[in-house]
Amino acid sequence: MKSTTLVSVLALGAAATFSTPTFAQETYFPIIAKGFSHQFWQAVKAGAEASAAKNGVTITFEGPNTEAEIDKQTDILNAAIAKNPQGLGFAALDSQAQIPALQKAADAGIPIVAFDSGVDSDLPLTTCTTDNVNAAGAAADKLAEAIGGEGEVAAEIHDQTSATGIGRRDG
């Protein structure tokens, strides 16, 4: 939960730092995740909601039903950008597919904070993520040790389009 809170605080901080204060304007910050169903995303949502309540920020937590719906995530992202939020938190299902939408956000002056999975772009102000290459490498070392350094091992990666999946594969 610490990393979830960190992502939320960084995202909300970026929104507060880079938005223009307006009297009686509510601070609105959409958080667009990769999905809802996995326990991980439920923890991210809970952390984001707790941080938003603590900081007096209104958030939405949205994402596609499954982590295979890249087009749906793009639609959600475009709808959020159209509401002209003070900032945007985003976990990309595909490291390249949403770059045009993120460019629209950047052009509109909406600060972007990427989390969990980055994009192949410098549009986000920052990306908060695990070093998946090193984490997967450490796991592979432990597995090799457990099997005595010999034998065959299969790696099944959850996807080949997100920075998370690619990093875990390459580690």
Residue ranges: model-predicted function:
Residues 1-24:
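Gram-negative bacterial Sec-dependent N-terminal signal peptides
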Residues 2, 22-171:
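A residue-level marker of the well-folded mature domains of exported/periplasmic proteins
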